């Protein structure tokens, strides 16, 4: 077999990503067709720039899903090393490829003879798992603390604002260096932080349901029991880790989370939560002076009902924008951490680690570093 030309490489990559293209076409067709019924999401498709940005985001979401969950678009195992493929240029054929094995390294091989294309696509699975979930957890923590701080004010606001400013004043990279050092990880600090931070979704869902259904106690109790049971199972599974300081109810531990992944996840939530807190606090301080809040107070509604069902819905615009932006910031942060070798395993196909490995021979073999950079 001969080396593929760049035209053949591009065509093969486009064909390999066919499930992604089909998903994008279906998503956009349905979204444009029903955009008038989709509220704020539908308005996105009135903007050309908005659609382009959304397409780029959803491309990597679908790529990560099909690569990680369904294993449809990867040409090779992103961790396996293939003899004779070290630093090979894009389009190099594999020697002795089996019948059911893809016969080319579409974007070449890296310094450890691993497929660059497969590692680039597999790296997106790390991003689509950590970035949205970490941002969601950070928002739940920030909202749970920011609403009462802005609504009540006083000493509670002073104490929480001081803690938030203290965290924000700490250098982010230095914080990550501290959390991933073996000595700190042996103390169980990441697990203790996870136990605290992951409790906020439980608190948020509890007060959300209770404030809405408090007038129908029987229905409230049923809904709360079901939701809290599921969340508690997830909570226990997230904070438990083999060999860690925290081992709660190992018999009902549904899944194991890699220690490096948990450290990165907790660190991202910890860094983002204070910023979300400050945004929510400022919005709550502004909105609590509105007439509809005074009307709710006159009706005798409780504080948490007012905060969650009067103030929070009217603050959704800035929060949605910040949520989307923060996912992008988190993606960049994950790449930075991977580049410095913090948290995730060295052989992980995350984009930052791949770029770091490829830069060492950038002048001779640029393709391993350039592919994940784009």
List where the protein language model places each region.
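Alpha-helical transmembrane segments of integral membrane proteins
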Residues: 114-374
